[in-house]
Amino acid sequence: MILAHPQNKLENQLVKIFHSSNLPLHFNKTGNKEFTNYQRVSIIILLRRSGKSLRQFIDENLSESKWISWLGLKKIPKKSTLHDWLKLFSMKTIRQLFTLLIPKKVKLTAIDSTGIDSWRRSKHYEKRCEEFGEKKLPPMNYAKTSLFVDVEKKFILDWDLVMSHEHDVKIAERIFKRNKIKNIYGLGDKGFDSENLHEIARANGINFFAPVRKMNKRAFKDKRPKGFYRRQCKENPPEFKGMRSIVENVNYVLKETQIASLRSKKHSMRERELGWHLIFYNLKRVIGLTNSKEIQTFFILKIRIYVFPDNAPNSKNL
């Protein structure tokens, strides 16, 4: 892959990811080879960066973009072609690409769940239809997204997506079982208070803390919660427990700046859509950290205070 132009920072990271992923240039040995997998991955990430539909992205963003020459495209893909690319890469491949952007050194993590609109609909017209319409509109479906975040660098380490009302503990168990980073601390809110979750977390290298839920009013005040790890969380909470709010900040930034809603109708495609969004989010974090390392400036301000005697006459002599 020879690039005859100076790369921008996003393109540089895309090249690094593709070379590290060990994906072949083409999945097929014979047949049509108009597009390479590097071009497919790059265009899908650019699609998620735009936040537009497939047709709008092709007509407004890609048609007159420099990325056509940067990626070496022989022709602009059509909407149906781009849709086929979204189905081409499985969740296993997307997670493999995602793991390439995870930092190697992680000390403190946090987990939290949030809801994302999975059916884009105007709230204003929804309210007007309910006021004047004879029939109520069907309820809005929300995709429950749980994010496992590196607190220090704000990278997303893992995620899970469900369309049902599943408890936070069950989702966290799946995320912790997939964890491969050892000797780290984890933080969660009261929704993750479970002795079984503490055991799973420690079995997978996570020293997890979650505040204990409020007990029954009829219980004694000095009654201790059941479970060894739950008692530890109540009696010896860590000093950095307030850092859990950073995962809420990551959720807010992700929903306000990148994922307004999930456009896909099928759940399998929603998972892939969210996966590509999170890949682009971590790419932005990588680019942001490299920028901060390259442009680190320190200013030393010295302030000297000089004291001059006041030669004005005293008020008594006036």
Outline where the language-model segments fall.
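DNA-recognition alpha helix
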Residues: 54-71
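Helix-centered, glycine/charged polyanion-binding patches within enzymatic domains
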Residues: 190-257
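A short glycine/serine-rich beta->alpha loop
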Residues: 27-33, 70-71, 134, 264-266
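Polybasic low-complexity intrinsically disordered regions
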Residues: 32-33, 46-49, 59, 84, ...
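Non-catalytic DNA-binding core/recognition domains of DNA-processing enzymes
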Residues: 36-39, 61-63, 78
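Basic, amphipathic alpha-helical segments enriched in Lys/Arg and hydrophobic/aromatic residues
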Residues: 232-318
